[in-house]
Amino acid sequence: MIKHINKLMTFGLIATSSIGFSQRLEDDIKVQTTQKLNEVYNLVNQNYLEEFDGPKIADAAIVAMLKELDPHTYLIPKEDVQSSNSQINGSFVGVGIRFQIMDDTLTVINTIEGGPCEKVGVKAGDKIVTVDGRSIASVKLKTSDVRENLMGEKGSLVVLGIYRKDEKEILSYDIVRDKIPLFSVPSYYMASKHTGYIKVTNFARTTPEELMNALAKLKSKGMKNLILDLQNNGGGLLSVAKFMADQFLNEDKMIVYSEGRKYPRENHIANDKDWRGRYYGGVENGAYEKGKLVVLVNESSASASEIVSGALQDWDRALVVGRRTFGKGLVQRPYELSDGSVVRITVARYYTPSGRFIQKPYDGGVEKYYKDKSNSFENGEYMHRDSIKLPDSLKTKTLLLGRTVYGGGGIMPDVFVPLDTMELSKMYRKISRKGLINTFTFNYVDNHRDELLAQYKDFDTYLNAEITDKSMMSLFWEYCEKEGVDYDKSDYKLSENIIKTLIKARIATNIWDFSKFYPIYNANENEIFMKGLELIEGKYINKLKLDY
């Protein structure tokens, strides 16, 4: 017995000693690495032949170091932190306009409802020519210059000099900067009598309230089916993805789980007690647990979008329609550095409820990782489902109906919709690269705003009207030729629909706001949306017996 105890004690000492030695070794390596970095910097500082920018060199070293880890661990320089946080926070401080720079002139497309500029009477079509008495016209104005001039501290004053048609003198407006919302739900509407549509562009702190407001409005209009559009949504906050999925899944269903080297497994479950009983815009949490649901995704849907679509697919709650998603299955956490810059470090992997890890491989380096989309295009993966490699080792089953789904590189939709490349003619690509549809429609509305508003009393009237008639298209082609793009009859035949659709949609956004883009674009050009609408209102979705 004593021998046995002694053996255990000896083993315990060896184990403890081994753990202690391992920890000391790890600490020694950390110290040596830090010393090495400092040593090289000091040698450069003491001996390099010319003066150099120390902070710039340090940032470059940090960027190179983080690049060796994974594509999503990176440094945000101090000067970029505010704009980066704006997307996550869902707001920024400014004057409240949507603008476009035309011929080196800052022109107001429209004012943001309730914002500082709207309150004092700034109008769509106004041209901002001075800021605090300084001319900003004809100085090769860039978007970054506009932000620098118009953004600032909440409550601070900026004086704008504005040129307005039919006014003889420059108008002066005192604007008090305020918090301006960045909408992550830019559009929602009834796509048919019983089917609602919600577009979500990212997962920000304001998204829960925006989503619930949209659901409440659509329910009040008789919505029985819902299309949730996550196309081109690159993600955002994990907590917001959890909230969104919770609106469609009933109690106690897992949404996602995460796990990392320093972070033990954490399960994220529907109907978290922190949200139970909360109301948003008159709708209680768990807002759409019953009813047909289709989720739209494509190759630019990533991260939080994949958490939501993966959870709803795994629980057989929704039909996922579109093309395979980006494949980002890593969780980042931000850490502020002493100089105000921020480093975002990957701390965990996330897994869908069925256990799928959907991060695509990145062992070939960052450049190869981000070229994967163009490689997928060249390999035909966007045009043909059969071109996508789906080995049996990546197969798993959904949790209720046992349908086959795949991990290992994005969420594979239940219904694949190929990308139509035929309409992307050589002529159209030139028009697109030069941004000619945007500039033409902007100028057209700027010159015809009053008559357009008189002709189309509301958006519904405009939506059902034929806008791109012969006279409109004649003006467009004259403009294109002036800008160096010649009309090609055969190319136009291929691209007619997309060109006319975008002209009509962009005119609408310039007359009203950006929410009006989607009803026009979806109904005429968005094939993933059209397939989703067909499926949700047809018999196919009923045959699947999804959990609705």
Describe each PLM feature range.
Residues E39, L43-N47, E51, P55, ...:
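Structured segments of extracytoplasmic/periplasmic soluble domains
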Residues S305-V308, L337-S338, Y351-K371:
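Functional cores that coordinate and move charged inorganic groups
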Residues N45-I109, G155-S187, V256, N522-L533, ...:
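Extended, small/polar residue-biased N-terminal targeting/export presequences
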Residues F357-I358, Y362-Y548:
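Conserved functional hotspot residues or short segments at active or partner-binding sites
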Residues S22-T33, L37, Y41-G54, P77, ...:
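Cleft-lining beta-strand/loop regions that shape enzyme active-site pockets
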Residues M1-K30:
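Bacterial Sec-dependent N-terminal signal peptides
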